[in-house]
Amino acid sequence: LCHFVGKRLATSALLLTIAMGMLSAVGARADQANVTMILATGGTIAGKQAAAGQPGYVSGADSVKSLIEAVPELKEVADVEGKQVSDVGSQNMDAKLWLELLRATSEALARPEVDGVVIAHGTDTMEETAYFLNLTLKSDKPVVLVGAVRPATALSADGPMNIYNAVVVASSAEARGLGVLVVMNDEIHYAAEVTKTNTTNPDTMKSPNRGRAGVCDTGECVFFSPTTKRHTTNSAFSIGDNVASLPYVAVVYAHAGMTAAPIKGALDAGAKGIVVAGVGDGNMSDAALDALTAAAKTGVVVVRSSRVGSGVVRRNIEVDDDTRGFIAAEELNPQKSRILLQLALMTTNDVGTIQDMFHAY
């Protein structure tokens, strides 16, 4: 069962059902429960060690069938089906796999009997895949990304409980219309907000600016408030079946002593846009600033984000964005700024229009 704080969801019919003992536990499925589809892409959640307790493992070694069988309690929540989309560590996720996953997810959501989709995914780039799907899917049905920090064979593996909670959320009517979600470590996060914050701690996925969307607790989930960002059915972005790639956008990392070299490298590689992971409020050295200003004058779209990890990059504070023709990323980190810019460049290179997109999405 899922609900928003302060909102009563239970109907008298459901209360009567519970009173008659026909529902054995919170979150248990009704006889008429529809399908929750699990799409597996690989990642640590499907990883295997040579021996339990050893640090090394092979990512994506387990199949979607194994992931489902490891959590027999899922049958009390929903009728679960599985499909293997890929078996990669998420460091190897790319636009080709995103497009394949978008189409597999859309196909599943189009089935009337499917209530929602869970995507098992590595945590390294989970936030990027979630955000891409958040901008391109055209359904109000729940889509939940889930992963693990410990492989499936580890002592105290976190994957099984994460999958259970993800299926609870994906099968919930209350998760409809919220966009793509991430469920990890008993927490629910919106795709536009979430980021990975720790390399090895299961409590790694956080939403540093606006906070988590909700929580899960053994078959029950509670949502706190809806997101204010546009997504899914309210998104202007659309990916046709004939799209095979996305525009090349580079991310350059600012640091003390930064030169124009990484910017020149991005331009030489054919970048249509450049996102700066700037210091502080999206700042950079004078050398980098001059190189990016020159690039913007040639039509390359430049976005200032921040390497800090939280906060807002605003226009015209230390950098005169109006004069230089730059875009301020607002709340988006560099990796999500890159995705939004890639999608924006498929339809426009107008700086004002793209700045509005960074405000809306």
Q: How should these model regions be labeled?
A:
Residues L1-L15:
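Bacterial N-terminal signal peptides that target proteins for export
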Residues S12-S24:
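Bacterial N-terminal signal peptides
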Residues V26-A30:
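Sec/Tat signal peptide C-region and signal peptidase I cleavage site
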Residues D31-A108, D290:
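ATP/NTP phosphate-donor binding region
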Residues Q32, L39, G43, S63, ...:
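Accessory alpha-helical/coil subdomains and C-terminal extensions
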Residues I119-K141, M284-T293:
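Short Gly/Thr/Asp-enriched flexible loops that form oxyanion-binding sites at enzyme active sites
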Residues V146-T218:
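Internal gly/pro-rich beta-alpha loop/helix module
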Residues D281-Y361:
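C-terminal non-catalytic interaction/assembly regions of soluble proteins
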